[in-house]
Every structure is written in structure tokens, then in C-alpha cells.
């Protein structure tokens, strides 16, 4: 029932005059960090389209109000505010646009929406004036998120996808970011789509060379690899789209092919990058997809599958690392993947969690491993307990230093 409501909502938005804004909510977006910059950041180009009346510096912090309706949850409508913080032009430093008050603060706490994939659909003004309303869907389940990511590809934390609703939701969305054409692809890739491992191997020659920090390296490598993936996708799909389709079945077949490839990449990319970084930084004692109790397969088991099943190996020296791009609800899936390990580690790129979510994770025996540059996006009270990727690697290389 709920999924049919979601599908109907998407169809309505795609068929009418809406502009959609899609992202995963960071802790700053929801106020979970406790910082003063609460609200959704809006790029200047979007402000010009949606709220032209505030795109100026004739006065301090011009703003406009609009009605915010949350279709996904039982929340009362609220009065959202689109504001241009332009104090840089008045002797101070701030220069950014945000949407604030789009859901009352109390509902953030109730819904635990930090990390959730969220769609904001702005009803465009037919006369070119300011938008008067925004219709919001905060995905409450992985099933809802899968519907969106099947259509438009993986939505990674920090990424913003926006555009006319019919273009983004109403058909085959080829890309969400400008394709970088600086890469010269191998000739045989013009004839076949390379595997994820092949793309990562090719990308290695384009990584930033002056960093030895695994936290920085991971984020840079993900960016480069994704740029190359988009270029390969364009190479194989764009001409087909331009030529058009002889039937609906042909269109659906291509859409399914693109969707399956995107999901496959999203599921393996992060694990492959971590595996390479472990080896580069001297952490060689690990197993991927090793079988544990109940035929479970954790992403990484340390130091090996053999050690895990060896009754003589010290249990306190076993480690497990689960890998989730986002961890809003998915973190619970990892709790019983290795019964012998009472504190499991979870690597994520999610931009913050609420204090309540963090406490629930900690009480369940989950320790977060997060790239260092993302720590500031978490509530200040928990930052000291977050582990960097570099610290995780250093701890385990030391722990297993005596293993041949």
C-alpha cells in the first residue's frame, strides 16, 4: 500500500510542472549537528530559477516564504523560508542560500531523517515568479530509496541532483553530473563495458599523487572512478538514446541495463577501493565475503576466515568491517554477521547521524569509521568517538604485525 502511494506521488510530480531537488540529508540539513547553518543549501543557479526575488544584494538577507507539505509522513504543513544570507556584501563573511524551516525541528527528531534520501518537488510559477509551495518525500525505507536509485543511479552523500521533474523522474536519466571528458579510455572499452575492477585499475593513474592519507585518498579515488564510470556510460548509451527507440520494450530493456549496471557499481565500488587502500597501507591480513555463522558474509573479516573459525585464535583480536555508503537504517543488517565479534566496525560516507541514532548504534556494539573530512558533519558530542580510516588501518596493522 505505502509503495503504491509513493509510486503515485512520483508519477504526479513527474507529470506536472515541478522542479525536483534530490539529496541525502546531512546532519547540517536536519540540525543534528547543533550548528547555526541549519537548512538545505541551495546552489545559486537553482535560486535564480525557483526564487528570483531573493537573488540580489540590495538588502541584507532577502527571503521569501513558501508552504512545505510532507507527503511521506503525517506532518502538518509548515511555512518554509528561502533565504539568501548575503552578509559578505555588507561587511561580514556569509554568502549562501538555504531553505530553512522546511520541517519543524520536532519532526526531525521524531522521524530520524538524517541520512535519508529526500526529494523536494517545487511547483514552478507559470509566470516565472517565486515558487509558492514545495512537496516533500523523505524516504522511510530502503525499498523507497531503491525505487529512486534504480531510476537515477546511486545518490551518494553530499551529492545533489536537480532538474525538471519530467526529465529526472519521467524517463531514463543518463547522468546526474557533468561528464568529464579529459580521460582517454582504452580502445576496447568502446566495444564492451568494463568491470568495476577494470575501471578502478585504470583510474589509478589519475589519482592525486601528493596524498598519503587514506581518508583523503578514498574520497579522491571515488570521485575519479565515478567520473570515469559516467564517461563510459555515456559512451555506450548516449548514441542509443539519441537515435530513439523502436518500441517501449527497447526503451525498458536499455533502462534496465543501465539501472542494473549502476546498482552493481554502487554495491562494489566502495569495497574495492577499501581493499586496495588496505593493501597499499600494509594491512594485508583480511578476507572479503568470508562465510560465518548461518552462511553470513561480512564485507571484511580480519585477520582471516581461518582465524575466525579457529577456536585457538584469540577472540579479542578478531575484527569485522561492514561497508555502507549510507547507514541510516542499513546498519542493523550487520549486527549478526559475525557472532564471535561483539564490537563491529562500520565504514560509511554518510554526512552525520543524529545523537539518538548514534547512541543506538553504540549500544548495539557498532563503531563508526568515517573519513576524517566528514567528521565535522557529525554532532560535536560524538566526533571524538568516530574512527578515521587511517586510524582503523593503523590499529589493525599493529594488531596483526606478528602474523606472517
UniProtKB/Swiss-Prot annotation:
Gene Ontology molecular function: DNA binding; type II site-specific deoxyribonuclease activity
GO biological process: DNA restriction-modification system
InterPro entries the record matches: DNA-bd_pseudobarrel_sf, EcoRII_C_sf, Rest_endonuc_II_EcoRII_N, Restrct_endonuc-II-like, Restrct_endonuc_II_EcoRII_C
CDD domains, per the entry: EcoRII-like, EcoRII_N
SUPFAM superfamilies associated with the record: DNA-binding pseudobarrel domain, Restriction endonuclease-like
Keyword presence, Zinc: no
Protein name, UniProt field: Type II restriction enzyme EcoRII
Organism listed in the record: Escherichia coli
Designated gene of the protein: ecoRIIR
